Regions:
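Alpha-helical membrane and juxtamembrane elements of multi-pass inner-membrane transport
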Residues: 5, 14, 18-21, 60, ...
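Solenoid-repeat scaffolds in large eukaryotic assemblies
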Residues: 56-59, 74-79, 108-109, 146, ...
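Transmembrane signal-anchor/signal-peptide helices with a preference for the extracytoplasmic
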Residues: 15, 39-61
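Soluble extracytoplasmic domains of inner/organellar membrane proteins
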Residues: 91-111, 115-216
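N-terminal positive-inside, membrane-proximal cytosolic segments immediately preceding the first
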Residues: 1-36, 54-55
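Short extracytoplasmic
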Residues: 58-94
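Onset of an N-terminal alpha helix
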Residues: 13-17, 72, 213
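Short Lys/Arg-rich amphipathic alpha-helical segments
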Residues: 31-32, 45, 137
């Protein structure tokens, strides 16, 4: 290679290096920031998961400790002292209502109603509270109100639909409509999302009422 060619190559290489340095000075911080965000984001996610796990374990320990009290009133008081947010609050309300059922049924039913109407709770907890209130309240809750609550819970796609249909059938029995109750329960047995326990319970009731479950 001639000296002029060598000279031009050296100049070209220097220009490339200068240009690269300029790019790094101008845009290098973006690459560094991207790396930091990736690394930092991963670290943040891991920390958040660990923190969530620790909080869940602490919550579980607090609940178990509260339920170890011998007296139902002490258990309710201990549960009330647990700091909660979101779904945890719903769980505490349901547990407290269950404990109250042993000593103060009216207070338990009122607690379940409050939980079912608390829009700050996840929908699943509100629906469960409503169903438990219907079951626990029985005839103390007007028939039309129970029917209305169960109709909403028994809509297609609702997670508690099978149990709501079972309770709807029991309401029909309470009103002296065994044929309608059998029809509801046989339809329930044909559905795929019915648990084995519920299926056995409903089957026994249908048979006791003289219904036919041979094809179910």
């Amino acid at each position: 290679m001639s000296n002029p060619d060598s000279f031009f190559n050296e100049v070209t290489e220097e220009l490339r290096r200068d240009r690269m340095v300029g790019y790094l000075r101008r845009y290098g911080w973006i690459a560094v920031l991207a790396v930091l965000l990736i690394v930092g984001g991963t670290g943040w996610n891991e920390w958040r998961k660990a923190n969530d796990r620790a909080n869940a374990e602490a919550f579980g320990d607090s609940v178990l400790a509260a339920l170890e009290n011998d007296d139902p009133a002490d258990r309710v008081n201990a549960l009330a002292q647990i700091e909660t947010t979101g779904a945890q609050a719903g769980m505490i309300q349901l547990l407290s209502a269950g404990e109250l059922m042993e000593t103060d049924r009216a207070a338990a039913i009122a607690a379940l109603q409050a939980a079912s109407e608390d829009t700050a709770l996840p929908e699943a907890y509100r629906q469960l509270a409503a169903l438990k209130r219907v079951i626990a309240g029985g005839s103390d809750i007007p028939m039309d109100e129970r029917e209305s609550l169960l109709a909403g819970l028994a809509q297609p796609g609702q997670p508690l639909r099978p149990m709501a249909l079972e309770q709807t059938a029991l309401l029909q029995l309470e009103q002296g409509n065994p044929e309608t109750a059998i029809e509801i329960m046989t339809d329930l047995l044909s559905q795929s999302d019915v648990t084995d326990t519920l299926r056995r319970r409903v089957t026994q009731l249908v048979v006791a009422l003289g219904g036919d479950v041979a094809s179910r």
